[in-house]
Amino acid sequence: MTVAESPNLMVAGIGEMVLSSSTEARLVAYGLGSCIALAVWDPRAKVGGLAHFMLPSGPASGSNPVKFIDTGLDPFLRALESKGAMLSRCAIKAAGAAAMLTVGGGLAIGKRNAEALQAALAQRGLALQASSLGGNAGRTVQLEVSDGRFLIKSLSSVIEL
């Protein structure tokens, strides 16, 4: 996967989400370590979104809810629905959650992120159709809005989910 700068490239930085209904759009999150990129794509509406979550939980009234899975998932899903996506027909995929950082007593942020995401999706009646979570390597991901391809690039490989 070559991620070249173009007018159709939309980048989700840490704590950000990007959404598009343009079939020319490519949604990208660079340098995922313990963070998680969640890609959601509706094949009928041709709407895609990518959220770049940093931590499993955060303050209930923070200025950047998408930084945290517990406060950011609902705004992300609502934004997709406002663009015409129907969650029941969406492909939901994720990557990241590598073992890059530990906090305090050795609680792995990546593992906690993966667990929090899967639990939050389950609470909403949703599940991942595919994922590349864990390990100890960083990743860059790209969602092609035209066809829903979710590409994951690491130092050693490029895979498609």
Where are the regions a protein language model picked out?
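Active-site microenvironment for binding and transforming phosphate-containing groups
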Residues: 1-161
